Swiss-Prot record:
Broad class of enzyme this protein falls into: ligase
Protein's name in the database: Adenylosuccinate synthetase
Subunit structure: Homodimer.
Major place of residence: cytoplasm
Active site (UniProt): 14, 42
Function according to Swiss-Prot or TrEMBL: Plays an important role in the de novo pathway of purine nucleotide biosynthesis. Catalyzes the first committed step in the biosynthesis of AMP from IMP.
Amino acid sequence: MAKNVVVLGTQWGDEGKGKVVDLLTDKATYVVRYQGGHNAGHTLVIDGEKTVLHLIPSGILRENVTCVIGNGVVLSPEALLKESAMLEERGVPVKERLRISEACPLILPFHVELDLAREKARGDKPIGTTGRGIGPAYEDKVSRRGLRVGDLFNPTDFAVKLKEVLEYHNFMLTNYYKVEPVSYEKTLADALAVADILKAMVVDVTDVLDRARKRGDEIMFEGAQGTLLDIDHGTYPYVTSSNTTVGGVATGAGFGPLHLDYVLGIVKAYTTRVGSGPFPTELGCDVGQHLGIKGHEFGATTGRKRRTGWFDAVAMKRAVQINSITGFCLTKLDVLDGLETLSICTGYKHADGTVKDVPPMAADDYELITPVYEEMPGWSENSFGVTEYDNLPQAAKNYIKRLEELTGVPIDIISTGPDRNETIVLRHPFEV
């Protein structure tokens, strides 16, 4: 029987979702993005060749897959064309494989300028956005003044709507942030220039996916960022502007939640975070540097150095609660090779001395907690590139088993390297 599978991050993003999606798409007919924008960075390594995608779903490299960008994604025409050109230069027929919802909010130049101006105005307390206009575009959507892909197909009305929203934002840019206004004429011309290109890819996403489900096609939903960056459930306000959790599938792709069969949570064997915000298990010592260097922990989108820390089972419990995770994919296990001792956070100690196994909701509350650790022996053997579970070091197996016990969820896939072939699949999400 056909399966509909969600693949999402369970930490602060950068868990390795791109590789896993690419690995699993050999059995998928559709791969769907349902939230975020080109602030995501999904890195694929296939036969040693590296590809970084920010907006287009990771399944685009598969001939058998139709990729879909749902209404929950904020779409930058400029970013889409740039990414499409990069792929087409490598022989990938993007226009044949990609479909887009006409309800996608557009990211336009003034959104980018607002994003940059706001981060600068925050001084030494930035949110840590990518500066790509994601948040301002979602704000316009919620405020019901945003322009959508479908608006481009009526140039006269689009010009009027653009003038109104640009006057509003230019007032803020010039009077409050004291920066230059964005040109109406150039913004209009650039936007309308891509209208026909986008129109050729526009479909009714909800209807397409529903028909696919009824035909028995396999559908995969590809999340961006991670659970702990969710606008509602993350470490607010140090979060992204969309719902990165499983609920985003229903709202961002118009796909009924009762039709989802399996939720695969991608989780690193340790923890990383880019930008500002709480990070209870963060390491400022040599071990943290080791994880960062060996794990190549630099953001695929911004190039920023990622903060590193131990595995946080408390945060993962929340991710399991929110997402109804069926199974985990544990990534970057090989980065732990050579460490004598490993630590796992099993609780948060509060100021009153109590220890809780669930995280607080607000970022400020994290300042009052101390992580409680459980130590485990590390391993000196090499796990890099291992493709059979029995060939893993025994201490690595013990570590995996303990993570399963603490989260209450089985680890169905283990990634031991960046290439799609450097993987141990214990249970395939499309086959369970």
